[in-house]
Amino acid sequence: MHIVLASTSRYRQEIIARLGLPFCAEPPVCDETPLPGETALETAVRLARVKAQSLAGKHPEALIIGSDQVALLDDKQIGKPGGFEQGVEMLKWMSGRTVVFHSALALYNTASGRLQECVGITRVTLRRLTEAQIRNYLTREPDALHCAGSAKSEGLGGALLEKVESDDPNALIGVPLFQLITMLGNEGVEVLK
C-alpha cells in the first residue's frame, strides 16, 4: 500500500522523507475556513481529516496523511495572513507572547476505511519584536506568509522564538512525527524495518 501526503508544503514533505519510506505528495481539496463556533483544536482535526479523505478517490489502496495546524492566542484562531501587512499585524500582536499551536494529523487507510487522528500541542513564546524586525523577517522569509501567524520555526524564523514547549519538535512544523510513526505501525508499516 503506498503512502500519500495530502500537502504541498516542502517542510512537511521533508519531515515525512526523514522516515525513509517512499511516498508521493499531492495538494488536498479543502476549504480551510473555520466553522462557526469551532475551537482551534476542532478546526485542526477536521481539516486534517478532510485533507486526507479528499484524495481517497484518486488513491483507493493507500495510506493518506492529512495535516493541519491552527494557532491560538487570546482564544482567537490565528490563520495564514492574507498578505504582507496582515503578516506584520499578526506578528506585532504575537510579539512577546505565548501562542499555542494545534498540529493535527489524520492517517486514512482508503482500502479499509480506517481513520486515525492525533494532535500535537506546541507552546511557542515569541521574543519581543520591533516592527522593523518583523518587516525585515517577512521580507527575508516570504514563505512565512503561508504559515499560521506568519511564524515559522525553520530558517530565519528561529530568530522570532524565545521558547518552545512540545512533546514532539516536529509538531511545530505541522507533522507530529512521533505519533505518525505509531499510526503507520498500526497499519503494518514498520519504519525501522
Swiss-Prot record:
In terms of domain of life, where is this protein from?
Bacteria
Record's GO cellular component terms: cytoplasm
Q: Name one GO molecular function term.
A: nucleoside triphosphate diphosphatase activity
A single Gene Ontology biological process assigned to it is: nucleotide metabolic process
UniProt keywords, alphabetically: Cytoplasm, Hydrolase, Nucleotide metabolism
> According to the UniProt entry, what is the EC number of this protein?
3.6.1.-
Q: Spell out the reaction equation it catalyses.
A: N(7)-methyl-GTP + H2O = N(7)-methyl-GMP + diphosphate + H(+)
Kindly give the InterPro entries that the UniProt entry links to this protein: ITPase-like_fam, Maf-like
The record's subcellular locations are: Cytoplasm
Positions bearing the site annotation: Important for substrate specificity: Y11, Q69, E154
Name its co-factor(s).
a divalent metal cation
Q: What does this protein do?
A: Nucleoside triphosphate pyrophosphatase that hydrolyzes 7-methyl-GTP (m(7)GTP). May have a dual role in cell division arrest and in preventing the incorporation of modified nucleotides into cellular nucleic acids.
Q: Which PANTHER family match?
A: 7-METHYL-GTP PYROPHOSPHATASE (PTHR43213:SF10), BIFUNCTIONAL DTTP/UTP PYROPHOSPHATASE/METHYLTRANSFERASE PROTEIN-RELATED (PTHR43213)
HAMAP family hit by this protein: Maf
Report the sequence similarity comment from the record: Belongs to the Maf family. YceF subfamily.
Spell out the protein name for this chain: 7-methyl-GTP pyrophosphatase
